[in-house]
Amino acid sequence: MSRDSSLITGTVVAVQANFYQVRLDPDASTEGENTLLADLPILLCTRRTRLKKIGQQVMVGDRVVVEEPDWNDHRGVVSQVFPRQTELNRPPVANADRILLVFALTEPDLDPASLTRFLVKAESTGLEVSLCLNKCDLVTDENLAQWRDRLKEWGYDPMFISVRSGLGIYEEATNDSQEGRVASSVQSHLQGKITVICGPSGVGKSSLINQLIPALNLRVNAVSGKLGRGRHTTRHVELFDLPGGGLLADTPGFNQPALECDPSELPEYFPEARQRLALGSCQFSDCSHRSEPNCVVRGDWERYEYYLQFLEEAIVRQQQEQNSSSAEASLKQQTKSDGTQQYEPKLQTKKYRRSSRRVQHQSLQDMCQEDLDEV
């Protein structure tokens, strides 16, 4: 059933293969024949060929224009992507406001090195970073207090929750036994924002989402007994509506995210280093904060050794990229008769290239003319 519709806009909530699920804006549903949208305000869309030709990707979280709606089959075509406020590549999410990093205090035990790697990766996105620690009911008050004080030194104020009991998910502490364990609820923290939830596998991300949005019933897996790590249960990125308002993006779990940042930017991803740089400046503008004199960052703070480790990784990665670019610049791609591609060394200009017959003929004519002139 077709009609001359006005501009229909919506948000991409899921991407699978070449199809996009678009949740339409509330004003997209109209009176009369389109009242079905009130019950199912999601259209399964394809991407306009023009967008593909210009290289315009469609990501989860994108604000888009939908054309050619088929209200009976709930189909449509994405014809335009609005400019993005923010953009993440891994995971691919557009227009996110915050990253909610979820870890477990135990089962598996909380590893400071792994937590730091995830925090640095989250900080590198430029989004607001919130830290949520699950399974607080399985550790002692002393252990929990130690982690709270430790993370405060790192520059973070974590939320302690228990997915199993619901503590810290829906409401703040309600009695003296919970006082000191729960400062604020996750539900209230996420309202009105597009939040990307991420963290290693097996820490309870899917279970947390099931608590926040019970109707989803996401599949969960137990932690591997042999490896002490979680099994991946989320395979693709998807946005879910939160009952209290806002959207939550579930992402596949990772055990060790890759750090892909410039070495000079790394200090900005450590709150401790940022604080020191805000209070003073190093003697050298390009200080790497390793062995340079009069450095304000180098010093006695817990994660400084992690900073040095990640800095070395970033430097090695940068050198590998530069070497790779140089190698690619010296090669050219050739297509063989069977259709396969292969790379061959490029010849230096005017060094190994043979002169054309025309140039050779012209040279012979010039030589003959010189001989005639001498005669």
Where are these regions (language model features)?
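Canonical P-loop GTPase G-domain recognition
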Residues: 138-203
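Conserved beta-strand/loop subsegment of P-loop NTPase cores
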Residues: 96-103, 124-136, 155-162
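GTPase G-domain guanine-specificity segment
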Residues: 135-155, 261-270, 299-300
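Helix-rich effector regions associated with P-loop NTPase G domains
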Residues: 3-6, 18, 55-58, 68, ...
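Conserved Walker B
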Residues: 105-106, 135-136, 251-254
